[in-house]
């Protein structure tokens, strides 16, 4: 069967339809159950991280290696021609695309990944995060984890907590879950870090229910997924960061009254917003969530690099 994601750029979660999402998640489940160590044996993939990353970069590169691909790239742009000699992003991507079969890219500038697609030719670009804009592969592993733990992606109650203004993970995840029916959203954030209006407008256009709340306790008994985020110090001025970082903290005692199968997720890194006593509860699922990044990213790489895929 023809693969609709072959050589497709994945810049925003909106580049993927509901059917595309289901295809990626089904492929991830198959790869988790049945590893394919030679699936990308003759492929070369560029891992281009213009911004610091631990989990995303290592997860992507592990995914590449476990599928048998060769990996080239950099984890810091400071020592590249772009960083040292002032080469443009356009020229950097134009050159790299002559070497490889796919480009995985993180960049601090919003829109940089979309710009890269204009210079990569037929080489697909996978966005590993562009500023506070989009982080589609994090969303894929989030969806995979939600589906794995809840058995579905529709008719869910999802609370998102913390930095909802700059947190690209919650923007992408909300857009993705809005492709499925019957989902209800609870947004819990300080006013300075509230969910952007364009996300709320999108939910209204799709007829999705949402509400704003001032504390986690208000919604604890109602939710299936509690998605925590950190306040991103690197995206705030020091005075603003100090004011808001401690406003929303989850402790084990806060989980009293939670639904039995409610799971706490977090894109990581965790700072102070989830205390370590939560880790020992059956609700904590953020480390398993991070582990699922391998399978979600393997699935996406396998699909964009194979015109037909049979697992």
From Swiss-Prot:
This is Aspartate carbamoyltransferase catalytic subunit. Its EC number is 2.1.3.2. Carbamoyl phosphate binds at residues 55-56, 106, 135, 138, 268-269. L-aspartate binds at residues 85, 168, 230. Belongs to the aspartate/ornithine carbamoyltransferase superfamily. ATCase family. It is an enzyme of class 2 (transferase). It comes from the Bacteria. Keywords: Pyrimidine biosynthesis, Transferase. Pfam families: OTCace, OTCace_N. One of its GO terms (molecular function) is aspartate carbamoyltransferase activity. NCBIfam families: asp_carb_tr (TIGR00670), PRK00856.1 (NF002032). One of its GO terms (cellular component) is cytosol. Heterododecamer (2C3:3R2) of six catalytic PyrB chains organized as two trimers (C3), and six regulatory PyrI chains organized as three dimers (R2). It comes from Salmonella arizonae (strain ATCC BAA-731 / CDC346-86 / RSK2980). One of its GO terms (biological process) is 'de novo' UMP biosynthetic process. It catalyses: carbamoyl phosphate + L-aspartate = N-carbamoyl-L-aspartate + phosphate + H(+). InterPro entries: Asp/Orn_carbamoyltranf_P-bd, Asp/Orn_carbamoylTrfase, Asp/Orn_carbamoylTrfase_sf, Asp_carbamoyltransf, Asp_carbamoyltransf_Asp/Orn-bd. Pathway: Pyrimidine metabolism; UMP biosynthesis via de novo pathway; (S)-dihydroorotate from bicarbonate: step 2/3. Catalyzes the condensation of carbamoyl phosphate and aspartate to form carbamoyl aspartate and inorganic phosphate, the committed step in the de novo pyrimidine nucleotide biosynthesis pathway.
């Amino acid at each position: 069967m023809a693969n609709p994601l072959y050589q497709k750029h994945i810049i925003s979660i909106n580049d993927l339809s509901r059917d595309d999402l289901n295809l990626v998640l089904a492929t991830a489940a198959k790869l988790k159950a049945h590893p394919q160590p030679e699936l990308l044996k003759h492929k070369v993939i560029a891992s281009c991280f213009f911004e610091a990353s631990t989990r995303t970069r290592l997860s992507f590169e592990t995914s590449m290696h476990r599928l048998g691909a060769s990996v080239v790239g950099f984890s810091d742009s400071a020592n590249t021609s772009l960083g040292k000699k002032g080469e443009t992003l356009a020229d950097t991507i134009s050159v790299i695309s002559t070497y490889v079969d796919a480009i995985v890219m993180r960049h601090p500038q919003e829109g940089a990944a979309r710009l890269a697609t204009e210079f990569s030719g037929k080489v697909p670009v996978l966005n590993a995060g562009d500023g506070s804009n989009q982080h589609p592969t994090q969303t894929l592993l989030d969806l995979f984890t939600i589906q794995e733990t809840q058995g579905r992606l529709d008719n869910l109650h999802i609370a998102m907590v913390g930095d909802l203004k700059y947190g690209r993970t919650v923007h992408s995840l909300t857009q993705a879950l809005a492709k499925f029916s019957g989902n209800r959203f609870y947004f819990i954030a300080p006013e300075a870090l509230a969910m952007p209006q364009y996300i709320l407008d999108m939910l209204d256009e799709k007829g999705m229910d949402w509400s704003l709340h001032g504390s986690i306790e208000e919604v604890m008994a109602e939710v299936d997924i509690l998605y925590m985020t950190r306040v991103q110090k690197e995206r705030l001025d020091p005075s603003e960061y100090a004011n808001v970082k401690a406003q929303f903290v989850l402790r084990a005692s806060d989980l009293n009254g939670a639904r039995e199968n409610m799971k706490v997720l977090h894109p990581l890194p965790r700072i102070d917003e989830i205390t370590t006593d939560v880790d020992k509860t059956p609700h904590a699922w953020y480390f398993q969530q991070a582990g699922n990044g391998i399978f979600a990213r393997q699935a996406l790489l396998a699909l964009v690099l194979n015109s037909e895929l049979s697992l």
